[in-house]
Amino acid sequence: LEGTRNIFDLEGQTLEEITDHLTKTFPDAIIRVIGDPELQVQKAAFSAGAPGSQAHIRQLRRKDINLVVIGEAPEWESLSYVRDASQAGFPKAMIILGHTVSEEAGMEYCAQWMDAFIDEIPVRFIASGDPFHQ
């Protein structure tokens, strides 16, 4: 897996393969997917939490990015943009992990980082997990 802080080169993998990997990585998460399962992903952008639809759309407008993996987004904006693009034949897709799921690894890292210099009180990571169930 190569890339920058939030752009990853996933060339050679399909949307379905990436979704399967994320489902195994986050077995308790309710992962939602928009796009053709057979889409050959080139590059993916990752946006934890909820940075807003304009951030997602800005990533999707790039020709080199054809998948965004996000925490959450307004369904009437980002999700509709991807669905419309996919249905119109553009190679675009979105995987929605859920807000909490997308941020939890970063919060665990943050707790470890803070624990290294905060001595006055204990610092611990408490996993919250996905609040939704099927």
PLM features: what roles do these ranges have?
Residues L1-Q134:
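Active-site catalytic microenvironments in core metabolic enzymes, especially phosphate/sugar-handling
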